[in-house]
């Protein structure tokens, strides 16, 4: 039986001041994802922003990560990628990394896509793999507290608006994307 406090435990782990180690997966291979998940990483991030990723491949990779006990994150295309956010969460991702956030309004839009009403605008579809963790009521009833929402800091506008972005309710972490910062 899966505990319904998984999100609380995840959030407590995030704020525990103990470093969490993970990697970006660009191989698009469930076998590689499974090997890394069993290697002791705390989290693995599947990159759907770059490269050819379809839902079948993503589904297999998320299952593989789950089998090894690591937390799964999926990087989507942006705050306006509602279908990518929805699909990743429906397939069982533990969290979402949203790139190209420049304003608090964009951050709010990203958070809204990740959360069920009344906190957000995520739609419900069942049966889905993510609900296997606790059943429909157990899942939908606590998922707003469970999902990890990370925003990628990578633009000058984001840095300029960092204070207001960081105040958006529902954000668990800001991730520094050093390559594109300008």
Give the predicted meaning of each segment:
Residues 1-182:
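Expand to "…catalyze enediolate/carbanion chemistry for C-C bond making/breaking, isomerization
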């Amino acid at each position: 039986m899966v505990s319904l406090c998984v999100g609380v435990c995840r959030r407590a782990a995030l704020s525990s001041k103990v470093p969490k180690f993970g990697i970006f997966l660009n191989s698009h291979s469930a076998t590689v994802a499974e090997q890394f998940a069993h290697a002791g990483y705390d989290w693995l991030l599947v990159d759907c922003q770059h490269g050819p990723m379809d839902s079948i491949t993503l589904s297999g990779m998320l299952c593989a990560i789950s089998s090894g006990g690591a937390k799964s994150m999926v990087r989507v295309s942006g705050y306006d990628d509602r279908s990518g956010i929805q699909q990743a969460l429906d397939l069982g991702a533990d969290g979402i990394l949203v790139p190209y956030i420049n304003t608090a309004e964009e951050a709010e839009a990203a958070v809204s896509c990740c959360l069920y009403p009344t906190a957000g605008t995520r739609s419900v579809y069942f049966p889905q793999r993510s609900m296997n963790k606790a059943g429909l009521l157990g899942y939908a009833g606590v998922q707003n507290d469970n999902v990890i929402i990370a925003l990628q800091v990578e633009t000058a506008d984001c840095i300029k608006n960092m204070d207001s972005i960081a105040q958006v309710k529902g954000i668990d972490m800001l991730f520094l994307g050093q390559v594109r910062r300008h």
